């Protein structure tokens, strides 16, 4: 037996003025906030990833590849000491 749950249909929601008033403000605000988060470099600081100019320093020019199958921890320690 099917019945109504009392919820508005999706078509009703997206055709209402209230929906578009709310979302015409929130969607661009989220886009601008994300753009500022990345462009100011705060994303690098929050997630701890190196900035593009910090991947290769003067003291560390090689690519940190792990080549040993049986001693990866020793290689990781060596890479982390070079930071």
From Swiss-Prot:
Cofactor detail note: With its partner (PsbF) binds heme. PSII binds additional chlorophylls, carotenoids and specific lipids.
Main location: plastid
Annotated TM spans: 21-35
Superkingdom field: Eukaryota
A cellular component annotation (GO) from this entry: chloroplast thylakoid membrane
Topology term for the membrane: Single-pass membrane protein
One annotated GO biological process: photosynthetic electron transport chain
Cofactor(s) in the UniProt record: heme b
Alphabetic keyword roster: Chloroplast, Electron transport, Heme, Iron, Membrane, Metal-binding, Photosynthesis, Photosystem II, Plastid, Thylakoid, Transmembrane, Transmembrane helix, Transport
Subcellular location: Plastid, Chloroplast thylakoid membrane
Entry's family note: Belongs to the PsbE/PsbF family.
Quaternary structure, from the entry: Heterodimer of an alpha subunit and a beta subunit. PSII is composed of 1 copy each of membrane proteins PsbA, PsbB, PsbC, PsbD, PsbE, PsbF, PsbH, PsbI, PsbJ, PsbK, PsbL, PsbM, PsbT, PsbX, PsbY, PsbZ, Psb30/Ycf12, at least 3 peripheral proteins of the oxygen-evolving complex and a large number of cofactors. It forms dimeric complexes.
Name of the protein this chain belongs to: Cytochrome b559 subunit alpha
Upper classification of the organism: Eukaryota, Viridiplantae, Streptophyta, Embryophyta, Tracheophyta
């Amino acid at each position: 037996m099917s019945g109504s749950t009392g919820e508005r249909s999706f078509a009703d929601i997206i055709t209402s003025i209230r929906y578009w008033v709310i979302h015409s403000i929130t969607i661009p605000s989220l886009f601008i906030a994300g753009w500022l988060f990345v462009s100011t470099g705060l994303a690098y600081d929050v997630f701890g990833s190196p900035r593009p100019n910090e991947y290769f320093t003067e003291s560390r020019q090689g690519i940190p590849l792990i080549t040993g199958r049986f001693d990866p921890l020793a290689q990781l320690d060596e890479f982390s000491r070079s930071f």
